[in-house]
Amino acid sequence: MSLVSDLINLNLSDSTDKIIAEYIWVGGSGMDMRSKARTLPGPVTDPSQLPKWNYDGSSTGQAPGEDSEVILYPQAIFKDPFRRGNNILVMCDAYTPAGEPIPTNKRHAAAKVFSNPDVAAEVPWYGIEQEYTLLQKDVKWPVGWPIGGYPGPQGPYYCGIGADKSFGRDVVDSHYKACLYAGINISGINGEVMPGQWEFQVGPAVGISAADEIWVARYILERITEIAGVVVSFDPKPIPGDWNGAGAHCNYSTKSMREEGGYEIIKKAIDKLGLRHKEHIAAYGEGNERRLTGHHETADINTFLWGVANRGASIRVGRDTEKEGKGYFEDRRPASNMDPYIVTSMIAETTILWNP
């Protein structure tokens, strides 16, 4: 195995100018990720330098067999933490040969929102808190849990340390460093309330880059869990009962909110979000009704509520924002399996472009 390890870690830049580009896209479920690699003649610094590519959409649930070709458009580049050197990860979106976005391509519509001059002028910032659960591969039960049984009640696990409280830290730390290497603006990690559940944060990131970075961070996490022999779940309520669910809280601000008098802008934006609560809930992730129960630090899915420092609210405003009269707010409704292209663009559209 030492030769295999040596080859995996082989530095190609010592012997060739060629690089490997791993093209990544979202699969047919809207949550699964796919990727394949190609050789390029030399280093690349911008997506516009990359060729489009294609794949068999009939094998991913994205095209019929008789017309199966789907075209990948490169959109964002990251350093490859697995191959290293000049090799890259490429986040793509998917189109028909005629140039129409396929139904699972949510980036295309998001890009239209973020390129709107009114949105661009507000320089929207996002900080996304991505929660996930690590599962034992063969039994699909959280790591650290006895097979067919349960650990002690919640309480000691949040940000906990020790072999009886923290499960999967090697995976989490590997992911943290790999994201930093890749150029993702990952800002932190922590153990969550349910044992075997973790969170990483991406941001602040501007506009559509926040969603690109979340997707690539998810991809890197899937690759690391593949190596580690565990399974990552983005199910918003992986274990029924008295256990916390998994969300993807979205922290958000605009230029106007970050400036003097911004708190009034924040309150107006929250009012707008309340008026479109049902539309946002419908777009914030599948199975979210199992998580948004009014318990375990959530608001009830049918009720819109906001408050300062209230983790049982739909929207939480921080004490610092209230005190300083400017800042950001946190939308606590998105589920862990949400599509960040949909969530980030919808928040911008509702708060900046929509007039009730």
UniProtKB/Swiss-Prot annotation:
GO terms for biological process: glutamine biosynthetic process; leaf senescence; nitrate assimilation. Expressed in root tips, root hairs and epidermis. Ubiquitously expressed with higher levels in siliques and roots. GO terms for molecular function: ATP binding; copper ion binding; glutamine synthetase activity. Residues 36-62 are annotated as: Disordered. It catalyses: L-glutamate + NH4(+) + ATP = L-glutamine + ADP + phosphate + H(+). GO terms for cellular component: cytosol; cytosolic ribosome; plant-type cell wall; plasma membrane; plasmodesma; plastid. Keywords: Acetylation, ATP-binding, Cytoplasm, Ligase, Nitrogen fixation, Nucleotide-binding, Phosphoprotein. Residues 106-356 form the GS catalytic domain. The modification Phosphoserine is found at residues 2, 48. The modification N-acetylserine is found at residue 2. InterPro entries: Gln_synt_N, Gln_synt_N_sf, Gln_synth/guanido_kin_cat_dom, Gln_synth_cat_dom, Gln_synth_gly_rich_site, Gln_synth_N_conserv_site, Glutamine_Synthetase. The keyword rRNA-binding does not apply. Homooctamer. Interacts with CRK3 and GRF3. High-affinity glutamine synthetase which catalyzes the synthesis of glutamine from ammonium and glutamate. May contribute to the homeostatic control of glutamine synthesis in roots. This is Glutamine synthetase cytosolic isozyme 1-1. The gene is GLN1-1.
